[in-house]
Amino acid sequence: TEIDQAKIVFQGDIKETEIQAFTLDEILNRDKYKNFKIDFLDIDVEGADLKVLEGLSFEIYKPELVCVEIHEKEIKQSVIYNFLINKDYELIWSGIFSHLFKRL
């Protein structure tokens, strides 16, 4: 879980607090973001990257570039990689944990 991953990263020194969260769709559907074009989407949410991606309607917003963290050793077998491939993205750059995908 995200909490377990955070405990590893922060060596168990975390405090759990409940907050209200919104999906990207909920944020982008607000009036001031209507018809908003996303050129570059950078997601760094300490292990919750897939949840964030699942909260975006890719068919509507179509970000040109998406940067996400993938911690699995075999990138092409990760859930996030396959999620983005299925949304018509290709991997164009990989760092240690950060990976950049481009819309086809």
What is each residue range found by the language model?
Residues 1-22, 26, 31-33:
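Glycine-rich adenosyl-binding loop in Rossmann-like folds that engage adenosine-containing cofactors
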Residues 27-104:
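Conserved acidic-Pro-Pro-aromatic motif
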